[in-house]
Amino acid sequence: MSKIPEDAIQCLDKGFVRLVDSMGGDDAIVQAARVSYGKGTSKVSQDRGLIRYLMRHRHTTPFEMVEFKYHCKMPIFVARQWVRHRTANINEYSLRYSEARDEFYVPDPEHIQFQSSLNKQGRMGTVSEDLKAKVQDYFKEISDRSFEIYSELNNAGVARELARAILPVNLYTEWYWKNDLHNLLHFIGLRSDSHAQYEIRVFSDAMAKSVKAVAPFAWEAYQDYAVSGLRFSRIEQNILEKQLPNRVIEDILEDIAYQITATLHTNKPRSESEIYPLYKKQGGLDSEEDFKLKWDSGEIKSGNVRELREFKEKLQSLKN
């Protein structure tokens, strides 16, 4: 078995993901977004806020300015799922030009399960130890026998492009794979999902680590809006408009008024006499006495003013 590079993340029994190179990061995203009026930012917090705005409103082009290039090694059946993401540039190990290597994927016992009765593309349930051992034995037997025949044909001078056809899809291949951040996040969103096949999920999770390291603000925004955020259909929104009591909306709006006030005060500290009028300006309804009790509790969290105001508008549109 060939050695896994020291700077790579091992995936499955013999595979890996290695970040070869990257171009740009969070700074490249904001640079591209601001080019229309040629103005930079002086604060890191402003860069973070802009990236979050871009992600929230799905302005994808600035994220395409960041590039990642990986060296990956995976079973062929994983590569065939992977290659469906057609925006990438790929150069794969050629079995027409080069000889195959005796490297085959054999699943660990804990990942051998039954076919799911609910998901035609999934697995479920607990398999007996005897059956797990039999599955592993079959994997090894077919792998060994197919490679033995392949080697025999190869030694007899049969064309490699033909001899390779008898090799099973658990044979390992490798490639260089390059993509931009926007499409890489789309890949991760699909392939790190709990419904994705385990064997490709481990590669996606490994790639996610490098994204988090290279573009931490973009990764944070992706987690907040793409992974953990919710979007409602027209039908779902109509249900909310009819069923969500106004008193619940008013309570949330009141919390937002406090959060906006706290955020504005954090960004630009005000005197004590200015804080309550600032809160009232944000639509707050509490009396000055009640406001002071809540404000002095220290439990009010700051956020992003733009996000909070957009959320406020959405909530107000739901009021009956």
PLM region descriptions:
Residues 1-320:
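Family-specific signature for flavin-dependent thymidylate synthase
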